[in-house]
Swiss-Prot record:
PANTHER family: S-ADENOSYLMETHIONINE DECARBOXYLASE PROENZYME (PTHR33866:SF2). It comes from Symbiobacterium thermophilum (strain DSM 24528 / JCM 14929 / IAM 14863 / T). Is synthesized initially as an inactive proenzyme. Formation of the active enzyme involves a self-maturation process in which the active site pyruvoyl group is generated from an internal serine residue via an autocatalytic post-translational modification. Two non-identical subunits are generated from the proenzyme in this reaction, and the pyruvate is formed at the N-terminus of the alpha chain, which is derived from the carboxyl end of the proenzyme. This is S-adenosylmethionine decarboxylase proenzyme. Binds 1 pyruvoyl group covalently per subunit. Belongs to the prokaryotic AdoMetDC family. Type 1 subfamily. Catalyzes the decarboxylation of S-adenosylmethionine to S-adenosylmethioninamine (dcAdoMet), the propylamine donor required for the synthesis of the polyamines spermine and spermidine from the diamine putrescine. The modification Pyruvic acid (Ser) is found at S65. InterPro entries: AdoMetDC_C (IPR042286), AdoMetDC_fam_prok (IPR003826), AdoMetDC_N (IPR042284), S-AdoMet_deCO2ase_core (IPR016067), S-AdoMet_deCOase_pro-enz (IPR017716). One of its GO terms (biological process) is spermidine biosynthetic process.
Length: 132
């Protein structure tokens, strides 16, 4: 069976997110798993770390690639990254779910197509579709 190396990669930065959400490893794990489910991804592994005095890093290893979050509660900041291989699972769905669950304001967003030659920036296309 031949496999495609085609993938989509989204990075998203959020600001003005509540400290309590960004410092709650249980909450973040729950919303990350739900984000993966919403986009149809299959979780095959995880690692979540609560830092002291604050902050969380969480990674879900997906059959289709990965979904990660790094939080800075003292700054109200979250860095989210989702890469999925193939055509079925849409990382934008996971990122949209996380934005809704966390609240805050998107201050950085990049959508890329990978694995089929040069990395292609799809950011404008995704944002235009999202605004319709």
């Amino acid at each position: 069976m031949a496999y495609s190396t085609y993938g989509r990669h989204i990075t998203m930065d959020l600001r003005e997110v509540a400290f309590e959400k960004l410092n709650d490893v249980r909450f973040l794990k729950e919303v990350m798993y739900e984000a993966a489910a919403q986009c149809g991804a299959t979780v095959v592994g995880e690692s979540f770390v609560q830092f002291s005095p604050q902050g969380v890093t969480g990674v879900l290893v997906l059959s289709e690639s990965h979904l990660s979050i790094h939080t800075y509660p003292e700054e109200g900041f979250a860095a989210i990254d989702c890469y999925t291989c193939g055509y079925t699972v849409d990382p934008a769905v996971a990122c949209d779910y996380l934005k809704a669950a966390l609240g805050g304001r998107v201050v950085g967003y990049r959508a890329l197509r990978r694995g089929s030659g040069a990395i292609e920036d799809l950011t404008t296309l995704h944002l235009a579709a999202a605004n319709n």
